Amino acid sequence: MKYSVFILFFVLFGCKSVQQINQQKVENAITKNALQLLEDKRFHSVSIAVLKDGKSTIKHFGELTIGKGNKPNDSTLYELASVTKTFTGYVAAKAVLDKKINLDDDIRIYLDESYPNLEFKGEPITIKHLITHTSGFPNMPLKSENKEAFFEGLKLIKIETKPGEVYSYSNTAPELTAYILERVYQKSFEELVSEFVLKPNKMSQTKFTLNENDRRRLVKGYNDKNELMPNFTRTLWGGISGLHSTTTDLVKYMRLQLDQSNLIVNESHKKLYKEGTDFWEGYHWYIIENDNQLIYRHHGGIYGMQNWFVIYPKQNIGISILTNTSFDETGKILEKVVDSLYDDIIK
């Protein structure tokens, strides 16, 4: 009996030790890569969240305000910028499963006017084309001061390639997707994101609309000349950008995206358009798959901050990195940090 108790104690203690070692390994990897990033003096702070095998690790470095030493923390609110599109993709995937929309629907069936210009030689633009950046829409909306102007801008678009054939990143298309989702559910896009994503996953710190307390926690970012940049002002639906979140909430979002029993997640991760040898577009996810790896990821960049959100389902890992700096090379630099961090974690 004593021998059995000893064995049980040894097993439990051994398991705990392994968990502690793995946790320390993740913490060390985060610290190493964060400090290396901050050696580039264009960066002032960085927050990194990692979820591995259900265990989260969050660390913050640097200062939010130059010269103040005010390190970010778990309550710091970041602008997610284009990572918001993955929420748009999730709601769109739910709409497909709910049979509210069909990927092959001509988008004009959801519009109040005819828009004869939104086709190419008789080939219509579909929901799938909007979601995969293959619609032929311009990058930025031609008019975006308000929703009414947005639809006037749609009339000015000239489609010059067959929809579904050429990838061209568009911030116009996801806004139209958000409008269509509003129309089929008869709820605002903000309500849909809250009802389908935020509330079920207890992401109470992720939101489009901020109150006074939220605004005090919102990051103010810089460009590479250390000039303070404005926060994004949403004038349309929020299909392309507009969500704010914390590292703790982003860990909850990782848990959602790693839940392979979730039918909406599985739908949103489907490969809808093949862009390269091992590169696909999903429901606003960039998907990389080859013999060695499967990755779902998205980058977000706005005037004064940038971030990457990356999921590795085979390894049960999620990584989010956020910084209060934005310039042309920021995305590529952060991408390399994520790659290095991932390599250090799985060594």
What is each stretch, according to the model?
Residues 79-82, 95-137, 156, 183-225:
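Active-site helix/loop module of the DD-peptidase/beta-lactamase fold
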Residues 15-62, 182-185, 191-195, 199, ...:
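Catalytic loop of the DD-peptidase/beta-lactamase superfamily, centered on the K-T-G motif
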Residues 57, 70, 138-141:
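Short, solvent-exposed loop/turn elements at domain surfaces
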Residues 25, 29-36, 82, 87, ...:
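Extracytoplasmic/secreted proteins, especially bacterial periplasmic and envelope-associated proteins
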Residues 60-68, 148-152, 221-226:
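Acidic-glycine-rich active-site phosphate/pyrophosphate-binding loop
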Residues 77, 139-217, 235-251:
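Catalytic-site signature segments of enzymes, centered on catalytic residues
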Residues 4-12:
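Sec-dependent N-terminal signal peptides
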Residues 39-47, 67-129, 161-172, 238-241, ...:
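Short active-site loop at a secondary-structure junction
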